[in-house]
């Protein structure tokens, strides 16, 4: 029988440099460890984020030389703690970057990687436009990760709007679905809680979604409200609109219970689409 897991989301502010991002996150990580957290979860672009017009321009470095990743690998090893580095900007090819997340084990090793599949190319309003693909190369593989505690599905931010990805992860065995994010304030106010609760309910999974909070250098801002949601869709922790640490306890027995009550993951049916046209239309 799995035992309850003490987790913490680090609700950090978007910082314009990697060094500032480390200085922002480390005190929160220390606070989480002092409180007994066994698994830490950081937001999207936790290694730094800024923007230029419609393009996101996070500071980046090659994976093997990335100061933020190295700092948290050392921290994981020193504290013997698992860490999800929600995502950082890793140098890619042709002048582009990769929005890549990691899970680090208790020895500080890279246990898994996930490259964000769905890139944030949207026009929220006439004046709020984002083109993540202008600088970022998309991934093409979902990430299901076996850890010492649970099977975890790692997604990132805009992925949240693509429920098929989450269903595929859940049907492949995920018990916890994670969506580190830097959700915008406007979309966050309208959709963040609803989308996270829906993904938890649809899949009978815990949702752990660490989200950055505050203004982004160059324009825009992130919503905050890091969430932990149980498999019944109930919010058990919400980080609100200030930086800090969000604590929760995750009991995987609740996954089996929710899926036993509503076993929809095993109820998929094949179907066809019948198109009915209005009379007179050819």
Region locations from a protein language model:
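Active-site-proximal beta-strand elements of phosphoester/diester hydrolases
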Residues: 4-16, 21, 41, 100, ...
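Active-site beta-loop-alpha junctions enriched in small/polar residues
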Residues: 12-13, 88, 116-117, 157, ...
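Cys-nucleophile CN-hydrolase/nitrilase-fold catalytic domain and related Cys-dependent amidase chemistry
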Residues: 18-107, 113-115, 184-199
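CN hydrolase (nitrilase-like) catalytic-core segments centered on the catalytic cysteine
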Residues: 63-84, 151, 157-246
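Active-site catalytic loop in hydrolytic enzyme cores
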Residues: 64, 92-172, 185-187, 194, ...
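Short beta-strand scaffold segments in enzyme catalytic cores
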Residues: 85-87, 100-103, 143-145, 226-228, ...
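C-terminal beta-strand edge segments of enzyme domains
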Residues: 113, 212-282
């Amino acid at each position: 029988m799995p035992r309850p897991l003490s987790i913490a989301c680090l609700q950090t502010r978007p910082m314009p440099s990697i060094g500032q991002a480390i200085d922002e996150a480390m005190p929160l990580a220390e606070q989480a460890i002092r409180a007994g957290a066994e698994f830490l979860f950081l937001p999207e672009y936790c290694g730094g984020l800024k923007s230029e017009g419609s393009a996101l321009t996070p500071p980046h470095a090659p994976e093997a030389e990335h100061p933020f990743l190295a700092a948290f690998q050392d921290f994981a090893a020193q504290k013997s703690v698992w860490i999800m580095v929600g995502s950082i900007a890793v140098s890619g090819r042709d002048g582009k970057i990769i929005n890549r997340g990691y899970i680090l084990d208790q020895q500080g090793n890279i246990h898994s990687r996930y490259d964000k599949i769905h890139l944030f190319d949207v026009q929220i309003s006439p004046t709020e436009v984002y083109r993540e693909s202008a600088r970022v190369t998309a991934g093409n593989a979902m990430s299901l990760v076996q850890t010492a505690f649970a099977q975890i599905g790692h997604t990132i931010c805009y992925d949240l709007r693509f429920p098929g990805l989450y269903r595929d992860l859940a049907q492949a065995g995920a018990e916890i679905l994670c969506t580190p994010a830097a959700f915008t304030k406007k979309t966050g106010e309208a959709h963040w809680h609803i989308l996270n609760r829906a993904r938890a309910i649809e899949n009978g999974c815990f949702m752990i979604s660490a989200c950055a909070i505050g203004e982004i250098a160059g324009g825009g801002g992130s919503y905050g409200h890091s969430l932990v949601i149980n498999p019944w869709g109930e919010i058990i922790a919400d980080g609100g609109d200030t930086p800090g640490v969000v604590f929760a306890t995750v009991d995987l027995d609740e996954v089996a219970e929710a899926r036993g009550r509503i076993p929809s993951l095993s109820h998929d049916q094949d179907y066809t689409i019948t198109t009915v046209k209005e009379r007179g239309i050819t």
